Amino acid sequence: MNLNSPAVSMLGGDTPAHGGPNSVLGGQGPSSILTGHGPNSVMGPNSILGPGSVLNPQSIQPMQSQQMHSLQGSSMQMHSHLANSNLNLNINPASVGPDRNPGSVMHHNLDINPPSVAYQNLTVPMTPLAYSVYDRDALTHQAPASNIAATMVPATPASQLDIPMPALQNIVSTVNLGVQLDLKKIALHARNAEYNPKRFAAVIMRIREPRTTALIFSSGKMVCTGAKSEEASRLAARKYARIVQKLGFQAKFTEFMVQNMVGSCDVRFPIQLEGLCITHSQFSTYEPELFPGLIYRMVKPRVVLLIFVSGKVVITGAKTKRDIDEAFGQIYPILKGFKK
């Protein structure tokens, strides 16, 4: 190819080096891309800067700095300043350029349809913009009011939550009926009563509610066992006294007294009984050949504890429920020190 020929010049102009109808830099040839009216021109009337182009000079309107407000729920606002901006980014697909060419999407008339962005304050009433996770700490998110009251959790120390509470298993109480009794007559006429003087010198009587057992002696003394609370033991003793009254005896209900309370608890961990017996030898007795549990005699309160390797603890000898709770509260930290 002869590059000096005017017909094949690629750099524009009429000289052998810069001219010709096929110039890409000058003239009005079909291959010109910088000037002229060629179909490939980037600056001509049919170029990307032409009247029907996207970047029409008339579609670029100067605009002062405005604030964009985007509603995020009821409490979130996003402020964005378009400082020193020369583009009005109100994009409406239905708008046209100044020459009514449908190719322009930026129009200086800013025709506003209901779904489009508002012109003055650029408020978007349709879908709120999603905010970043980094903005959540700086935003105060206000949830709608709820009819459900907030649950208040008391600040209870963890040490109190870990300590189990002992439960009453048996209460032994005594009553004086104040009259001599014929035990044979009681055994013959009363229900659920048995009397065998060769084995035991008392009538054994049982009732179902409260589920208890009474030992009635000829002297008028009575022992009530099996109740789970002091109130239940008192109620059962009164029922036994009423049964004796219905058999013709002038029985009274006097001198009611709780003699023994038995409670039990599970600490839920195995215990080293040998180490406990050696460390607390002054209060402990442990003979695994005779009894599998360690016998711990506490001085104050004056109770006896039976401690087993499985973690079960039986407290007996107490007069009140408070004594049982106090004794277990003292022994529990000691048992944790000998946890296997």
Swiss-Prot record:
Family the UniProt entry places it in: Belongs to the TBP family.
Compositional bias of kind Polar residues: 69-78
**What keywords would UniProt list here?**
DNA-binding, Nucleus, Repeat, Transcription
SUPFAM superfamilies linked to this entry: TATA-box binding protein-like
Annotated GO molecular function terms are:
DNA-binding transcription factor activity; minor groove of adenine-thymine-rich DNA binding; RNA polymerase II general transcription initiation factor activity; RNA polymerase III general transcription initiation factor activity; TFIIA-class transcription factor complex binding; TFIIB-class transcription factor binding
Q: Which gene codes for it?
A: tbp-1
Cellular location(s)? Nucleus
Q: Where are the sequence repeats?
A: 168-244, 258-335
- Nuclease listed as a keyword: no
The annotated subunit structure for this chain is: Component of the TFIID basal transcription factor complex, composed of TATA-box-binding protein tbp-1, and a number of TBP-associated factors (TAFs). Binds DNA as monomer.
Offer a single GO CC term for the protein: nucleus
Alphabetized InterPro entries for the sequence: TBP, TBP_CS, TBP_dom_sf, TBP_eukaryotic
Asked if the Swiss-Prot or TrEMBL record annotates the protein with the keyword Nucleus, the reply is: yes
| One Gene Ontology term from the biological process aspect of the record | transcription by RNA polymerase II
* Classification via Gene3D superfamilies: TATA-Binding Protein (3.30.310.10)
Question: This chain belongs to which protein, by name?
Answer: TATA-box-binding protein
One protein family per Pfam: TBP
Role of this protein: The TFIID basal transcription factor complex plays a major role in the initiation of RNA polymerase II (Pol II)-dependent transcription. TFIID recognizes and binds promoters via its subunit tbp-1, a TATA-box-binding protein, and promotes assembly of the pre-initiation complex (PIC). The TFIID complex consists of tbp-1 and TBP-associated factors (TAFs). General transcription factor that functions at the core of the TFIID complex.
Instruction: Map out region (Disordered) in residue numbers.
Output: 1-78
Low complexity bias: start-end ranges = 57-68
